[in-house]
Regions:
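Active-site-adjacent loop/helix segments that line or gate small-molecule/cofactor pockets in enzymes
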Residues: 111-115
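Glycine-rich beta-alpha junction loops
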Residues: 69-71, 137-140, 211
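Active-site glycine-centered loops adjacent to acidic/histidine catalytic or metal-binding residues
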Residues: 110, 137, 242
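General beta-strand structural signal in soluble alpha/beta enzymes
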Residues: 63, 67, 105-110
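ATP-binding/phosphotransfer module of carbohydrate and carboxylate kinases, centering on a glycine-rich
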Residues: 1-64, 73-77, 93-103, 117-132, ...
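A charged helix-plus-loop insertion that forms the helical arch/lid used to bind
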Residues: 78-90
Length: 314
C-alpha cells in the first residue's frame, strides 16, 4: 500500500470496525470488517481483537494505523473510558496496540477523529475560523478546530446544563428514552447550541452521529448565528479521520527521526532501553554508596583498634 493509504479502526462498546482508507479520495479503500467487541472489553482482549482485524487485511508492514477511541487521550494514554472497561484508564493505548500489532498505531479521541475527517473531506473542508463538530448519540462528542487546527479532548458534551451534564439533557439517546418528538428535541438542542455559541462564537457547527441522517427534521428549527450543517461522512468519519491522523503523525515521526525511516515503535524501544540503563545506573549508584559506607565503617574500626593498641602500650 502507498503513502496515500492508512488503516483506521473504530472501537465501540459493541463492535470494532476497520478498513484501509484511501487518503486521496477520503473514503474506505475496501469494505470494512466488523468484529464484536469482547466482553469484558479489557485492554488485553481488545488489543487481541484489533490484531485479528488488521491481520484479516493484506496490510504492508509500513502502513500506520489510526484508532478512534472512546476516551480522553493525552500523549497516547487513556485518561477516561466510555463504553469500554474502566481498566483502560491509565493505559498507554498507543504503546499497547503498537506492540501487539507490529504497526505504528496512533490513538485519538473518537469525536476528534470524526472532526478531522469532516475538516479534511466533509462539511468543514473549506471552513475557516472556529469550527465545532458535534456527534449526537448515546452521549455528545465534540471536536473543536481553530483555523484548521484541532483543540483535542474538548468534551463539550459535559458542560453544565440544567444542573447536570448537557448530554444527559439533549443527547439523541435522551430523545429516544423520553420519547421526545423532533420539535421537543430541537428545543433542547437550541439551549445547548446557544450556550456553545455564547462560549466559543463558532463560524460553523457540524452535526454528526447516526441521527444526522434525519437532519431535516430538527436542524431547520434551530435559530443560531452560525450556520449549522449535517456531517457528510457519517458512520465512516471515525475510521477516515483516524487514518488521516495516523498518516500525518507517521510522516512527522519519520521527519523528526531525520528521514531515516525510523518508526515510533523503534523510538519506543530506545526509550525502554534508556529506562533500563537509567535503572541500572541507579542500581550502580546505590551499590557504590553502600561500598563507600562499608569502607568508612572498616576505616573507623581500624582507627579504633589502633587507638586501643596505642593505649595498651602506654
Amino acid at each position: 500500500m502507498s503513502s496515500t493509504t492508512a488503516f483506521g479502526i473504530d472501537i465501540g462498546g459493541s463492535g470494532i470496525k476497520g478498513a484501509p482508507v484511501d487518503l486521496k479520495a477520503g473514503e474506505l479503500a475496501t469494505d470494512r470488517l466488523r468484529i464484536p467487541t469482547p466482553q469484558p472489553s479489557t485492554p488485553d482482549a481488545v488489543a487481541e481483537t484489533v490484531r485479528e482485524l488488521i491481520e484479516s487485511f493484506d496490510i504492508a508492514a509500513g502502513v500506520p494505523v489510526g484508532v478512534p477511541f472512546p476516551a480522553v487521550i493525552q500523549h497516547g494514554v487513556a485518561k477516561t473510558a466510555a463504553n469500554v472497561d474502566h481498566s483502560w484508564i491509565g493505559t498507554d493505548v498507543d504503546a499497547l496496540f503498537t506492540e501487539r500489532t507490529g504497526h505504528d498505531v496512533f490513538v485519538v479521541n473518537d469525536a476528534d477523529a470524526a472532526g478531522i475527517a469532516e475538516m479534511e473531506f466533509g462539511a468543514g473542508r473549506d471552513a475557516k475560523g472556529v469550527v465545532l463538530m458535534t456527534t449526537l448519540g448515546t452521549g455528545v462528542g465534540t471536536a473543536l478546530f481553530v483555523d484548521g487546527h484541532l483543540v483535542p479532548n474538548t468534551e463539550l458534551g459535559h458542560i453544565p446544563l440544567h444542573g447536570d451534564s448537557a448530554e444527559k439533557y439533549m443527547a439523541e439517546s435522551v430523545r429516544e428514552r423520553e420519547e421526545l418528538d423532533w420539535s421537543q428535541w430541537a428545543e433542547r438542542l437550541q439551549e445547548y447550541y446557544s450556550l456553545i455559541e455564547f462560549l466559543f462564537n463558532p463560524d460553523l457547527i457540524i452535526v454528526g452521529g447516526g441521527v444526522s441522517k434525519h437532519h431535516k427534521k430538527y436542524l431547520p428549527e434551530l435559530d443560531l448565528r452560525a450556520p449549522i450543517v449535517p456531517a457528510e461522512l457519517r458512520n465512516e468519519a471515525g475510521i477516515i479521520g483516524a487514518a488521516v491522523l495516523a498518516r500525518h503523525a507517521e510522516d512527522e515521526t519519520r521527519a523528526a527521526a531525520g528521514g531515516n525511516g525510523r518508526k515510533k515503535s523503534g523510538l519506543a524501544a530506545d526509550k525502554a532501553q534508556a529506562k533500563l540503563e537509567k535503572s541500572a545506573k541507579k542500581g550502580d549508584k546505590k551499590a557504590d554508596k553502600k561500598a563507600r559506607k562499608n569502607d568508612k565503617k572498616a576505616e573507623k574500626k581500624t582507627e579504633k583498634n589502633s587507638a586501643k593498641k596505642s593505649t595498651s602500650k602506654d
